[in-house]
């Protein structure tokens, strides 16, 4: 969804966006069918991808590492060596002013709530970057 927002804003040339899992459970899997369905209903194009494992190199390479929930943040910190010295690791909803965990549709079955959470967080993140980078 962040890629979609960046593209809609005409800012794709300013970003390199990637996605990675913090656990091995979903490695190699495509997005969940419920996610795919919700994106189609919202007319947001799906970018084909399969889950890959986050690595310590991601911390060195990317400016922002965004997790959906507290468990993601804990796993990301572990993967990157146990600390976040450069303050690159964030919970997505921090950018919406909430800081709570994204509602996980795996447990809730509520893809609409998750969509709203992710859209709010991604919109806030894009606003922050645009403001800080003057783009």
Per-segment meaning from a language model:
Residues 64, 70-135:
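Phosphate-binding/catalytic loops
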